[in-house]
Every structure is written in structure tokens, then in C-alpha cells.
């Protein structure tokens, strides 16, 4: 062929030149030099439109369709056309729901191999996409782009440094985006991947390099699912019906809390926080410990009848210590410790007196006029009467019932009626919080247990909260209603059932309910079920597969305030 031949003739000559002879025109001399160095005949063809050099006629035919717009491969189902036959073949998998690529670790299936490769990064700690501003790494390019859009270091980029070097920034962007290109030896993939029990601590990341082949991935999955593999500790148990977080959890307190006196230092620090907060906090602690003692087989009565180590006689204390040395431990009882019933009544009276009177060392602390002279069991040998901490009838005036009288002369009798308040300490919690917010002495707060089915006052079950929760479907639902009185007249009150507190001011109640979006945050918007706490609410959403919806209800209607 002559040197003045057309370009088409040159292309045909190049394509048909299977012996690898040099082209006389010299236009592709550089490409032929590449063929000579690599030892392969690539049959290079140059595009006239954009100058792209294609490796073969088939590559050139596919590339030229991008300029002409030709799409010869068309789907006969939906009519979508493609430039290559392989794209049409992959498109047919959409209509047939065929997913030939499956993850060897989980049940994920996909239609494309590159999607499977991207999914495998979830099971490993490989993060090949790195931010160019702050060097944070991500597993997907989309996550990295979203981060770069709002990266705080755009104006002042931070140059990351590879591990093992100080003050040596990356030289190019390719190394920054590829963590596998960091300097240093790569760990060997022949060693088995560590199981969860071999990790240093809970939450530690696995090694950054995944196993090399599928067999090692399957072996890792088998080790993780083995019965002997260690797992994370279970979440803390939340007992329903007790005060605490959302009114349904109770802190673990030592069994001697009921016998602890009213501390002077704690009262001084609490007075600075506000008024009757120390007294209310002490009552909460005593009531919470009373619930724990009531759940034991012996009940609260046995726990109150057991004297402390400091109040036991020297003979009983020495005999108990000698029994411990010999390996035999005897439990304290009224007969073994030789404590008289009158001493028990005096101890109980002192405990109840500490609930309503301050410590003797705090006489200089200013108190309201009605609390300057509380009852003291040390000054008076036989006090007239004392109010019981029964939240079913908790009033601040001097009108009491004869059944709720405890004296130091009569023995302490724990009847079924007196045990009824232990499972419903949440009502006492709301009452105590109302006492804290109220500074007037002529306001009476009463708590009534109402039966919703009969709409009348009924007796409360004396079982423990754990027993009541087991038979919740068989028993009737009990509701606590709070009434606030001032000078004999009933006041309007607003109650937040989520936080277990009442408000005497409507504006304060509206501001507080704005935190909960004027709705109950523990009620499912899909089925209407109300959960006891946040943990049960999240478990309900997961197990029932509800779609989260943002529903904002209207605020509650205001009642007429006198």
C-alpha cells in the first residue's frame, strides 16, 4: 500500500495484519512500539471522532456506537435498548428475578458481581474510600461523597499521615483513597482470622484485611456461630412496675438502706438544691428498699425484725463470729439475738421518725413554721400518733385514720392492707414530686387506686410486682388517680404519665409536654400499643416490623382552671 492511502485503508491493513508487520504510514508508530515491548499484537485502531485508540475491531465497533447513538440490542419485554449484548443479558435477570451471586457469610443475593464485592466490605473492616480533607475512610463511595459535602475541614484540609511515620504526608491522592497502598508490610493471609473471644475488648475491630478466599470466610462464619463462642453480655433487666427510668426500673440498693439514718451532710447539700428535696429523696430511697424487701419470701416484716450488727448484744455477736470461724453461719432472728419486741418497735419508730424530722445536728437550718417542731421519739416517751407512709392515703394535714397509726407501745403489724402500697410506689413518686413543687402547707394531695372496669375504689392486690406481671392478663388493670386539694377545694392538676409527675400550672405542663411532642413517646403509631419503657418500645418496633411514622398529635385540651 502506498503512503498516500486513505485512513480507512490504513485501518483495514492494521486489522488484517496478523503477522505484526510495521505500518508504512507511521501514524501509529508509538502504538506499534508498545506492541513490540509487550510482545503482543493488539491490532490498535484509532477513532476519527475523539482520537481514542481501540484494541481491536470489536472494541472499535462498540465505541463508535457512542458517537452514532446506535443501540442494536433491544429487550422484547420492556423495550429498553443497549449498545452491548452483555448489558442486555444482564438486563433480562431483572425480569426473571435471577440473583446468581450470593454472599458466603449471610443470605444476601444480588445480580451483579461488583455489587457482591461492595457487600463483602460489610463483613470486613476494609475502608478503601478516604476523604481528601480529613482522611476519614468509608466503605462506599457514596458515604464518602456525603461526608465530603459537609466536611468541616474543607477550608483547612488536614493532611493525614500513614501509620508508623511522623509528619510525613501522603504524596498523591491515589494513596489517600486506597488504604491498602499504605507503606509497611501487609499481614499474612495464611493465619486464621481471630474469633470474638480472642479480641482484646468488647467493641474492638477485627483485623483490617479480610480472609483471602471463600473457604476462610466460611471457616470464620462457623467459628462465630459455634456454641462456645463468647457473645456480648445481655442488656440489664428492667422490672416493670417499679420507679426509676420511665417509672419502670429501680436501682440496686444495699439491704441496709432502710436502717440508715438521715445523713446531716447529705441534707445540707440537698437544702442548697431546694427545700424539701432532701426529705423527698430520702423517702424515695426508703420506699424503693421497702419494695425490694417485700419481694423476698420473708417480706418486709422479717427484714424489720432483724436487728443490725451494731444493735445486737455482745453475746450474740461473739457467738456469731465464732460460728463463722467454725464454718457455720446462723441467721439473725429475734430468738437468737435475744432482742425484745419493744426494742424492735423502738428501732422501727426511729426509722419512721427520721423520714419526717431532720437530723439533730441541723437545728440551725431554717425550716417552715409547720416543721420546726416535728415529733421526736427520743423526747416523748409515748407519742400520740404518727402518719404511715401509705401512698393510698397520703395527706399533709393532721386528719388521719385510726388504721394508719403506729405507736411505740403497740407491736408493728404488717397486714394485707398495709402491704398494698409496695407494688405501687410510682404513685408515691408522683406525690413526692408534687410535694417538692408545692411550698404551701395547706395543700393536701391524695392518691386513690381506681378500678377502671367498675369505676369505684377497690382493694389492691398484695402480690409483688413480679407476680403481678406474670398474671397481667388474668387480673384487672389498676389505675392511680391523683387529686389535689387546697383548703378543702379540689384543684386542677395535669399529670405526665411518661415522667410520673403532676403539675399545678397549665403553662408549665404545656412546656413540659412540648418535650414529648405533645404525645406519648412510648405509644406505637402503627398499632397503638403503649410500652413500659424505651427498651420495650424499640423491641416492639423491631419484632413487629412497623414502619416508623412521624405523627404529631394535637395538644390536649385545656381544662377550666378555677
Swiss-Prot record:
Region ranges (Disordered): 178-210, 293-342, 361-404, 451-473
Cellular component terms per the entry's GO annotation: nucleus
Pfam families assigned to the protein according to its UniProt record, in alphabetical order: zf-C2H2 (PF00096)
Database matches in InterPro entries: Znf_C2H2_sf, Znf_C2H2_type
GO MF: DNA-binding transcription factor activity, RNA polymerase II-specific; RNA polymerase II transcription regulatory region sequence-specific DNA binding; zinc ion binding
Tissue note: Expression is strongest in the anterior Fol cells of the oikoplastic epithelium.
Record field: compositional bias (Basic and acidic residues): 369-383
Zn finger intervals (C2H2-type): 45-67, 73-95, 101-123, 129-152, 494-516, 522-546
Places the protein is found: Nucleus
Recorded superkingdom: Eukaryota
Biased composition (Low complexity): 307-326
Compositional bias segments (type: Polar residues): 327-336, 456-471
Predominant place of localization: nucleus
Keywords: DNA-binding, Metal-binding, Nucleus, Repeat, Transcription, Transcription regulation, Zinc, Zinc-finger
Entry text on domains: N-terminal zinc-finger domains are similar to the Ikaros clan but may not have the same binding specificity. Key residues involved in binding to the consensus Ikaros target site (5'-GGGA-3'), found in the promoter regions have diverged.
Family per similarity comment: Belongs to the Ikaros C2H2-type zinc-finger protein family.
Protein name per Swiss-Prot or TrEMBL: Ikaros family zinc finger protein
